Amino acid sequence: MRGSALRGNTLRVNDPVTRRLRNMQDKRRRIFTAAASLFAERGFDNVTTQAISDRADVATGTLFRYAANKGELLLMVYNEEFGRAINDGRGLAARAVDPAAAVLAAVEPVLVVGRLDPPNTVAYQRELLFGPPDAPYRAVGLALVRDLEFLLAALLSAGQPVTEHRAVAARRAARSIFAVLHHTLVQPSAGILPEHDPDADARGQVAQIVLGFFATVRVAPSEQESDPQGDPDVLQQR
């Protein structure tokens, strides 16, 4: 029986489909590692797809089967960084004493990772928001944005009664907070207010949005929602 089981396992390991899958995973790992190291060494603008394929030891045509262009390669690499930052922020937020502190804790790792390599961060934000609509790694990045916004909305609403009014306000606030993060991360390339500390400004703006959220949810929906037709969340719920 044991010999039969071992032979069965050997067959599965040597199965052509299994070997093909392992080869694909290995090539993707090599491409990811090559792209990550070259972007870190030279910066996004100074790296070519040929250099990445050479370092990964794959043909250029093979490289393009895993990522259609250099922008997708950057998204593939930096989605990993963004995802880790969101998870780190989730852990920090869980230890915060109140919703406002939790939101600030949640965004802190995103700001920190964005400062590790500002030029590449700017390129990542550009590809994330303005890349081709059908790019698969861009779709992964946008899903991470939605995850972050969902986390922020949940933190704002923690411990409070669930109402449509509060849910809409929390989603709006979460989107506004991501907009602040995006603006802060691309600020080095824009030269806006160079004398200001962008991270301190971002924290101040996030705190202001949080205060505005709590002020908003204390107002009756009929008073605050003078034109609900202008809000896509309300329209979608209808």
Question: Where do the model's predicted regions map?
Answer:
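Basic, helix-initiating cap at the start of DNA-binding domains
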Residues: 1-42, 46-58, 72-75
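Hydrophobic/aromatic residues within well-ordered alpha-helical segments
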Residues: 27, 70, 81, 85, ...
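Short hydrophobic/aromatic patch on the recognition helix
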Residues: 56-67
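Alpha-helical DNA-contacting segments of helix-turn-helix folds
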Residues: 67, 74-81
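Hydrophobic alpha-helical connector segments
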Residues: 76, 90-119, 167-174
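Amphipathic alpha-helical packing segments from all-alpha helical-bundle domains
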Residues: 83-86, 91, 133-161, 171-175, ...
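Short secondary-structure transition hinges
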Residues: 112-150, 190
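Hydrophobic/aromatic-rich alpha-helical bundle segments in the mid-to-C-terminal region
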Residues: 122, 142, 159-209, 217-233, ...
